[in-house]
């Protein structure tokens, strides 16, 4: 070890000891792993804070144009390891922790995941923040500081149970409370006309208090900001009620306001839950817009140049009410005339759509919006009036066209269409894969595209290689470093250099040893969390994502049962041992998804305890899936299941993370699977099933799922076993309604239509896995082809084509 490195390591060790004494308040020789995590985090926080302040000063002095990224969720995961890597302090911290006989990875494991998101939407936002900082974009993320996240998942008797995720109960070293940054956010009341203007009267008020988290760039001194809002009641408690013994009433007003920032996506199956969701969306959007305008006016004397200095991006429709809120602020508070305000608004906003399913496009009842946001509803009506007048000139005498375009759905209960508001109020709208973006303008947004064909574009998603390869898979990263050098972390296209090594027996041996080590780690985690012992020498077949019918976890289960029945029928055949791994959460009110989780456990209980099967087949469900769990699963996967019905998955990013770690994909021609196939080669991916045009044609011609049940004996046997209670003997009809729905016309996502192709393709997977050298060659080819799927590339495209922001190199 060099003298300079010793000096640095010694300095970091001294800082750790100092923070144990001064910040954590423990004697160094009595420090627990949690104490050490807190102390090391403070060492990193100190360095990041210096860079952060310098970044803000530089951007303020340069009066840089900034992107403001509004997202309901940011699934950040843990921060410590990422921060130490960004600061190039990982080795120094590891050496410093050696004084306490502890490893850096064990210390980092004591940090809870930040419960600020749920699925792909939030993880994409987190990857984007990482890339914005790394490529040097002046940027600001805005969201909500959820105290309890969405929920932590537990499994009881095979059923998902939800409980709060109190990730903040011991505080977090990564946030900076901003006591001086608080904004009022109003709800309710009514609108009156006074002096020719609309005035919002008698609204209730909650305070939005700012908490900042730092987002370090890699290979740069830049540190960006994620500002999160906490809801604070205007008065803490009703002291009079408290003093009379009415303790519930004393706290009721406080809870009514502050529950806005308690939980991500509260159950919306009740009127109160729906109202709370709308309040959440407006709460963070209003505070964020007030904040960005206040910052702008500190740097510029006028709002006339707002669109030149700020690009506001809507990550899906949750922040779409921001279009009406910016108009309210400009017109009502800044006295800007309507046409000028609207022109400014449209130049400022851009919008990413994340779904192709019409039923998933967010809408709000007009009556609810009238109750919660009466002024905004009035503004939306005015925006709609002017937009429809313009649209009528584009296509005269076509009322059906105007009805589809309208911001208000007049069929049945009147509802505000938030996607339509986002499109009308933005200058650019993007999808997140080439197929998705094409389908947007061909299907759900075709009418808008006929008016504004240039408004729509594509930005294929990406993932940050710093977390999903360098951090999640350190052994593979070391192999890449010794083969390619270290700069692939900032230029993922360099992975193409692996193509020259994919047939190299020595390189393959190293690659396969690393894969097995990661599988051993994953197997230990499965035994610890799911209580099931699995063999790392079996194929690890992985489907980890939100549980949803369109993602077709149920199709995967049908294949598992098919395989189980085949093993029992042909026990002496040379079966490829396989461990099928599921993980993911079902929304608390989504009963079908919860039934799928229960079925996975019921099927697993039978298969895993059948001595006739042994290690030939195991089925496991890993509970409480999140970023840190994914960092264990992704490196250990052999096969990546990406099996959504073609035309339903906008992009997917789990497919990218798994391929980046050397898993082969079995999937439909959907979302980003198509682009993965184009980049890794047709021979290095397993594609099955109907393509999007075939799905559409079959649906239009009249899809009869019973035909497949009647004509495919293996499928009939599987469905009969499920419906007949083979996997639920304590309640034989538990899954009868599920099977009846599949056969009787409820198979909307065409599981039965794709079943035969899926099962046949799984046999091809087995055939390849029997030849380890060929499998390894294709796994390496997958890693080599993943350069284009860096979120750095995605963000550079956003910056160039949508936000028009130049990187600020530090």
Language-model segments: which ranges?
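A conserved ligand/cofactor-binding region detector
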Residues: 1-810
């Amino acid at each position: 070890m060099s003298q300079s490195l010793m000096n640095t390591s010694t300095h970091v060790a001294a800082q750790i000891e100092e923070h144990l004494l001064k910040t954590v308040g423990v004697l160094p020789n009595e420090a627990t792993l949690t104490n050490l995590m807190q102390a090391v985090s403070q060492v990193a926080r100190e360095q990041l804070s210096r860079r952060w302040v310098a970044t803000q000063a530089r951007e303020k002095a340069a009066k840089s144009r900034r992107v403001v990224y509004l997202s309901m969720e940011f699934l950040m995961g843990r921060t410590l390891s990422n921060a130490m890597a960004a600061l190039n302090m990982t080795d120094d911290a590891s050496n410093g922790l050696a004084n306490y006989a502890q490893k850096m990875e064990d210390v980092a494991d004591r940090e809870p995941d930040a419960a600020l998101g749920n699925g792909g939407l939030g993880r994409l936002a987190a990857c984007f923040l990482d890339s914005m900082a790394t490529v040097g974009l002046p940027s600001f993320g805005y969201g909500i500081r959820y105290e309890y996240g969405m929920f932590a998942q537990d499994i009881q008797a095979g059923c998902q149970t939800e409980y709060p995720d109190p990730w903040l109960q011991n505080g977090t070293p990564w946030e900076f409370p901003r006591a001086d940054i608080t904004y009022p956010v109003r709800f309710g009341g009514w609108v009156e006309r006074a002096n020719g203007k609309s005035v919002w009267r008698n609204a209730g008020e909650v305070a939005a208090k700012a908490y900042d988290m730092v987002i370090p760039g890699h290979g740069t001194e830049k540190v960006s900001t994620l500002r999160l809002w906490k809801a604070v009641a205007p008065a803490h408690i009703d002291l009079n009620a408290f003093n009379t013994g009415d303790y519930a009433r004393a706290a009721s007003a406080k809870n009514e306001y502050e529950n806005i920032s308690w939980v991500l996506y509260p159950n919306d199956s009740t009127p109160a839950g729906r109202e709370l969701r709308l309040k959440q969306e407006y709460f963070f959007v209003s505070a964020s817009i007030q904040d960005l305008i206040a910052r702008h006016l500190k740097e510029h004397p006028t709002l006339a140049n707002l669109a030149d200095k700020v690009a506001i991006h809507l990550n899906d429709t949750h922040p779409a009410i921001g279009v009406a809120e910016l108009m309210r602020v400009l017109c009502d508070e800044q006295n800007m005339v309507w046409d000028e305000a609207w022109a400014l608004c449209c130049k400022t906003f851009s919008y990413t759509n994340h779904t192709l399913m019409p039923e998933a496009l967010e809408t709000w009842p007009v009556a609810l919006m009238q109750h919660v946001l009466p002024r905004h509803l009035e503004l939306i009506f005015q925006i709609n009036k002017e937009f429809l007048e313009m649209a009528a000139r584009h296509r005269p005498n076509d009322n059906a066209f105007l009805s589809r375009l309208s911001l208000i759905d007049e069929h049945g209960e009147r509802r505000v269409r938030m996607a339509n508001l986002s499109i009308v109020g933005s200058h650019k709208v993007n999808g997140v894969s080439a197929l998705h973006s094409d389908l947007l303008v061909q299907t759900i947004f075709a009418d808008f595209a006929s008016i504004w064909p240039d408004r729509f574009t594509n930005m294929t998603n990406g993932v940050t290689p710093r977390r999903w390869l360098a951090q999640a898979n350190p052994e593979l990263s070391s192999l890449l470093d010794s083969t390619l050098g270290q700069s692939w972390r900032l230029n993922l296209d360099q992975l193409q250099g692996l193509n020259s090594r994919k047939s190299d027996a020595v390189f393959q041996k190293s690659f396969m040893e690393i894969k097995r080590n990661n599988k051993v780690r994953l197997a230990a985690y499965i035994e610890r969390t799911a209580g099931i012992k699995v063999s790392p020498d079996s194929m690890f077949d992985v489907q980890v994502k939100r549980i949803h019918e369109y993602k077709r976890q149920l199709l995967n289960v049908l294949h598992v049962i098919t395989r189980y029945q085949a093993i029992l029928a042909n026990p002496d055949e040379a079966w490829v041992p396989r461990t099928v791994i599921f993980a993911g959460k079902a929304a608390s009110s989504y009963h079908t998804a919860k039934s799928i989780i229960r079925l996975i456990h019921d099927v697993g209980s039978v298969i895993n305890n059948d001595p006739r099967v042994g290690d030939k087949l195991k089925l496991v469900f890993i509970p409480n899936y999140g970023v840190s769990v994914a960092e264990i699963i992704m490196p250990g996967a052999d096969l990546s299941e990406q099996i959504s019905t073609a035309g339903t998955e906008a992009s997917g990013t789990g497919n990218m993370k798994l391929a980046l770690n050397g898993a082969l994909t079995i999937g439909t021609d959907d979302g980003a699977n198509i682009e993965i196939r184009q980049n890794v080669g047709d021979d290095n991916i397993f594609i099955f099933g109907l393509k999007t045009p075939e799905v559409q044609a079959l649906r239009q011609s009249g899809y009869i799922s019973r035909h497949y049940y009647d004509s495919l004996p293996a499928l009939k046997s599987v469905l009969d076993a499920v419906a007949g209670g083979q996997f639920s003997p304590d309640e034989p009809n538990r899954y009868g309604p599920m099977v009846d729905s599949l056969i009787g016309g409820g198979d909307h996502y065409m599981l039965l239509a794709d079943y035969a192709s899926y099962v046949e393709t799984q046999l091809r997977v087995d055939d390849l896995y029997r030849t380890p050298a060929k499998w390894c060659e294709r796994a390496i080819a997958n890693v080599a082809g993943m350069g284009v799927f860096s979120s750095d590339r995605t963000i550079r495209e956003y910056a160039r084509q949508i936000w028009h922001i130049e990187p600020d190199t530090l």
